[in-house]
Amino acid sequence: MLRFAVTLFAVITSSTCKKYSCLEGETHKLKPSPEPNMQECTLYSESSCCYANFTEQLAHSPVIKINNSYWNRCGQLSKSCEDFTKKIECFYRCSPHAAHWIHPNYTAGIQSVPLCQSFCDDWYEACKDDSACVRNWLMDWEWDESGVNHCKNECIPYSEMYVNGTDMCQSMWGESFKVSESSCLCLQMNKKDMMAIKYLLSESSEESSSVSSSEERACQKKLLKFEKLKEEEGGETR
């Protein structure tokens, strides 16, 4: 009994530390807190790892750059592609849960964050006709002395740079993201994430590489309830 209690305490403590801390990037807070005046990334306004003034860079379309990283080296992103790129940027900069997937060798980075297949496919569809000159947006740029990014190669369409949504999700941000085998225990960068994160945070480190069938069933059940509730709310507003 004592061993169980000690083990349970250790699991809860570890989960709590990850849940209520932020990544250690230049723009990250030490701990998440409310940011009611966010202009973008409002999904995380109740508990944010970024300050509201950071989101000013994302508030106006087209987005030119974030800090010293230019988004328009191959022309302005289409609005649909930009919207998905913002979702990823917002998660990394502002999500209070990103630190759950903190990179073991780089505390400002993330590793193997599970994205839903549908999200990756939609992201690819939104960006396939846009152009890029790097495959890995974290590592493949040429950086000048001022820390500004430049292309090393010619610009080509996303549809040529990446084979499909899976390839794009698992390549563009290096090893930051992976496509989940589950359609529920994964992130879509919307309000449904709060439900999925509840189950993802409860997974032990030993189970992190595989999907727990009991958690999958519980998540799917919650997802159905969530979607039914949203449909009912939509009907009431018509």
UniProtKB/Swiss-Prot annotation:
Required for the transport of riboflavin to the developing oocyte. Expressed in egg yolk and egg white (at protein level). This is Riboflavin-binding protein. One of its GO terms (molecular function) is signaling receptor activity. InterPro entries: Folate_rcpt (IPR004269), Folate_rcpt-like (IPR018143). Disulfide bonds join C22-C49, C41-C90, C50-C94, C74-C155, C81-C127, C116-C186, C120-C169, C133-C151, C184-C219. It comes from Dromaius novaehollandiae. Belongs to the folate receptor family. Glycans are attached at N53, N67, N105, N164. The modification Phosphoserine is found at S204, S205, S208, S209, S210, S212, S213, S214.
